[in-house]
Amino acid sequence: MAYNYNQGYGGYDAEDPEVKGFDFSDQSIRRGFIRKVYSILMVQLAITMGFIALLCYEPKTKAFVHNTPSLFIVALVVMIVAMITLACCGEVRRKAPINYVMLFIFTIAEGFLLGVSASTYKQDAVLMAVGITTAVCLALTLFAFQTKYDFTMMGGVLLVAVIILLVFGIVAMFVHNKIVQLVYASLGALIFSIYLVYDTQLMMGGKHKYSISPEEYVFAALNLYLDIVNIFMYILAIIGHARD
């Protein structure tokens, strides 16, 4: 199988004759793959929303977590290790049940970190961000399924955009200006919105030039999850800075 890692781990060129027998030409395989990915994604989002709700609406828990910074550090280390393992170790992310275990560990750690971050904002801002993120992600998903434009060829452009965003973010840390912060958050929300369309089309396969392998269901769910939580955090940042 000729994997095209320039387009993401586990991706391949759908026009490569070596993979024609293993692509998504079988509708039942494609539908089953998509159902599995979205089922995993829903569980991840439910866990994450649980942490956000707990840390935003339970004062004692919020106070304990904010007074115990070591919990945040441990969760951050666990999240990074789990994410690197899933991204770089193909045998781990393709083999059940270890792939589910690693994804669960990652989701718990990431959910906790997001809950801590969200708890620094006002409750109504968090609720507004959840609502806007839900609407945006549903609209983008429908767009990804319906549009004739193939976003799977934008992997290189999106990678450059993320690098620019990272550099911009470092600069924004030292420039305490409301406009700069709003521009940074808006750019982040835009980039990860495009990434959501890109990752959705990779999962869909079919007529798109690049697809993610059917055995990469955990990796596909991880990609979509990261897109959604990044969109949420950037939208939350936009709301927070707009109210300052």
Locate each region found by the language model.
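A hydrophobic alpha-helical transmembrane-helix feature that marks the membrane cores
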Residues: 1-244
